[in-house]
Each structure stands twice: as C-alpha cells, then as structure tokens.
C-alpha cells in the first residue's frame, strides 16, 4: 500500500515543477518520504540538465547587491526571456547574488567552483535546471570591495537586462558617504549610455588606430554624397581620442591656431584670451571616440552641460572633499554570445518525426 496520496503528489509537483507521473514515481521510490522524493527528482534532474547542455543560453538577467562599501553583479543566462521573468529564476538570482556577496566571489569562475549549502555549486545549478526546465549558466560576475573612504553603488535596469556597479575613491569617509547617492546616478547613466571603458587611457592603441581609419572612410564617403547634393561637407577629423593628442600634436595645433589669428588680424596681445577656448574646441572636435565610449568623458545624461567627470568633481567639491571614479562594471545580458538562427518549421518537423 502506498504511503502517500494525491495531495502529496500535488505538493511535490508544486515544490519541484516536475511532471505528475514523475512525482508519483519519486514518492513511490522514496516510500512516501517527501525529502527523499525531492532528492530522487534532483538526481533525475541531473540527467535532464545534461540533455540541455548543448542548448545556447543567451537570454537571462542581471542581478546586483550593494551594501556599505561592497557590491556584486552577476549575469545568469537562460534559453528564453520568458523563463528569466518567472519567480523561480528570480529566486535563483537572489540566491546566487547573495552567495557571491557573502563569500566575496570575484567572478563567475569563483562562483561556479564554490560550495553552496554544503554541496558543489555545479550540483546546485543542475537541480535548478531540472526545476526551471532550461539550461542555465552563471556566465559573468564582478565584485567591488572598498574601505570607509570608498563610495560604492550600483543600478539594475527595470527589465534586468543590464546593470552596473561602480566605485570612487574619496579623500575621507565623510566624502564617501556624500558621494554614494551620486554614484547611483552615475550608475544609472552608465546603464543607459553603455560606455565601454572608464577612460581613454584604457583604450588599446590598435583599436583607436583602426577606429580612426574607419571613421575617416565613413565621413569621406558621406561627403561624396553631400557634394553631389550641393550640401555642406562634414569635417574629417585627424584624431578621435585624447590618447592621440600628444604634446607634439597639441603644440602643432596651437601654432596653427596662432597662424589663423594672425591671418585674421587679431592683435597678438589678446591671443592668450582667445587660444584657450580654441584649443578646447580642438580637443572636443578630436576626441569623439572618448565622448562616445569613455564613462568619464560622456555628457552626463541628467545634465548634458557637463561630463560625468565634471559632475562628479562638482558634487565632491560641494561635499567639501574630492572623489575620483576608479572602476565600474557594466553587464548586459547575452552580449558577445553568438546564437544560431533556427529554422522553426524544420525544428517542428524534427520533433514530429
């Protein structure tokens, strides 16, 4: 005689999301013991997870946790965006984010090689795959751990498709406290504007060189069409990043500007008043890459009269101190993952065969 009834089967199904017949078989194997039945389903789930291993997980969500001078960000991928929106997936995200935060796990490798609730993380994730029903991958993660003079904050977009954690070094604990809400604003900016790096100093020289050539070709091509239409052509920049504006380049630019002023008949005694503005314009015209991709050089989305760098400096000064953004991490779900396009009709035919 079975030591369980329909209510037990229903309860086990609600707990695990496993099929009705699988729950009945699990309870039979466990002689009605609910915990053992869950364990039996988990063991079977490992096999189910293995079947899903070949699937591409390119959807998912981003989760963060910020507390004090510490922050963590995690990307978990699933196969469909639908799954990433369900409560079980969200609960998994909370568990993994808290696990990474509490154990100072600095990246996805550290998480995947960790132990959670007394078992290998890989086993825990396999159980979640069985419960949720799709391949799941903890793909990326990052950790910030500061001290009392470090301001830390973060932001996740409402759809959980991108998120940011960020830190700034400050001159004092008082300034760090004042700058913490400011960093929340900057994190929101970074989530929206998607900077690829903190500063032009982080660019690879080869990338800047290739990007410069590409932009020149694109503008020259566009100018051909503008000429054909009799419209004003666009300026073709020599440079696109501050990393290219060496002392020699700036000295040459200054001499060229002086020659222009002389040609315009401007008195030499007023050049010192005119040159700073013209040099600033030269820098602005020749650092478009920085303005697009460097967080510190982007126009602040909440006040585009100043850059992010200028906004942070202004807020730090108002707090009676100084602060410098030293690091940020922005993750967007699925970036960099190649997904093969499937022939839906062929897939259906394959399953019907």
UniProtKB/Swiss-Prot annotation:
Transmembrane segments: none annotated. InterPro entries: EF-Ts_dimer_sf, Transl_elong_EFTs/EF1B, Transl_elong_EFTs/EF1B_dimer, Transl_elong_Ts_CS, UBA-like_sf. Residues 80-83 are annotated as: Involved in Mg(2+) ion dislocation from EF-Tu. One of its GO terms (cellular component) is cytoplasm. GO terms for molecular function: translation elongation factor activity. CDD domains: UBA_EF-Ts (cd14275). It comes from the Bacteria. PROSITE patterns: EF_TS_1, EF_TS_2. Keywords: Cytoplasm, Elongation factor, Protein biosynthesis. It holds the Pfam family EF_TS. It is found in: Cytoplasm. The keyword Cytoplasm applies. Associates with the EF-Tu.GDP complex and induces the exchange of GDP to GTP. It remains bound to the aminoacyl-tRNA.EF-Tu.GTP complex up to the GTP hydrolysis stage on the ribosome. Belongs to the EF-Ts family. HAMAP family: EF_Ts. NCBIfam families: tsf. This is Elongation factor Ts. The gene is tsf.
């Amino acid at each position: 005689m079975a030591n369980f009834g329909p209510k037990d089967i229903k309860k086990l199904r609600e707990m695990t999301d496993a099929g009705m017949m699988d729950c009945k078989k699990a309870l039979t194997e466990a002689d009605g013991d609910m915990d053992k039945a869950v364990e039996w389903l988990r063991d079977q789930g490992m096999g189910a997870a293995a079947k899903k291993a070949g699937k591409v997980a390119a959807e998912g969500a981003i989760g963060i946790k910020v507390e004090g001078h510490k922050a963590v960000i995690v990307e978990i991928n699933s196969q469909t965006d639908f799954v990433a929106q369900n409560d079980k997936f969200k609960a998994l995200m909370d568990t993994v984010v808290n696990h990474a935060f509490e154990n100072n796990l600095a990246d996805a490798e550290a998480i995947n090689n960790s132990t959670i609730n007394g078992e290998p993380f890989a086993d825990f994730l396999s159980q979640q795959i069985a419960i949720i029903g799709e391949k799941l991958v903890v793909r990326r993660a990052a950790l910030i751990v500061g001290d009392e003079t470090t301001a830390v904050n973060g932001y996740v977009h409402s759809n959980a498709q991108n998120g940011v954690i960020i830190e700034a070094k400050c001159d004092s604990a008082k300034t760090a406290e004042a700058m913490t809400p400011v960093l929340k604003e900057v994190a929101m900016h970074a989530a929206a504007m998607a900077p690829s790096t903190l500063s032009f100093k982080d660019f690879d020289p080869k990338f800047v060189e290739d990007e410069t050539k590409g932009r020149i070709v694109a503008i020259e091509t566009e100018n051909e069409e503008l000429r054909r239409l009799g419209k004003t052509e666009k300026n073709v920049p020599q440079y696109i990043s501050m990393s290219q504006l060496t002392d020699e380049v700036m000295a040459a630019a200054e001499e060229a500007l002086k020659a222009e002023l002389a040609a315009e008949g401007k008195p030499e005694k007023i050049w010192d008043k005119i040159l700073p503005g013209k040099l600033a314009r030269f820098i602005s015209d020749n650092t478009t890459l920085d303005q697009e991709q460097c967080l510190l050089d982007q126009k602040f989305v909440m006040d585009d009269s100043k850059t992010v760098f200028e906004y942070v400096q202004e807020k730090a000064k108002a707090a009676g101190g100084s602060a410098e953004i030293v690091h940020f991490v922005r993750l967007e779900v699925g970036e960099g993952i190649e997904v093969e396009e499937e022939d839906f009709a062929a897939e259906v035919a394959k399953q019907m065969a």
